[in-house]
Swiss-Prot record:
Descriptive protein name: Putative membrane protein insertion efficiency factor
Top-level taxon in the UniProt lineage: Bacteria
Role description: Could be involved in insertion of integral membrane proteins into the membrane.
Subcellular location: Cell membrane
Keyword Cell membrane: yes
InterPro entries: Membr_insert_effic_factor_YidD
Main location: membrane
Membrane topology (UniProt): Peripheral membrane protein
Pfam families on file: YidD (PF01809)
Family label: Belongs to the UPF0161 family.
Amino acid sequence: MKNPLIGGVRFYQRFISPGLPARCRYYPTCSQYMIDAIHTHGSVKGTTMGVARILRCHPFVKGGIDYVPLKFRLTKNPDETYHGPYTYRRNKKTEVEKDG
């Protein structure tokens, strides 16, 4: 694991989260979303997206499916299509950049 930010999230997932009641209103969970966002968009943008996701995960929101978008955005991803694991998204991201 090269990224210390991902290491911090993994620590939370492994040692802190199991002691807390399940309360994330989205799928994937906010912690997994942050890991995927860091993998997809890098440390700064990925962490920013992860924090934005945590801030919109509260009891007054409906929740639902919210995968990491291929393009950087801080709001809920309107495209609920799963773009596959990180390696697939990375290839898809390259294709999107070529098209646009």
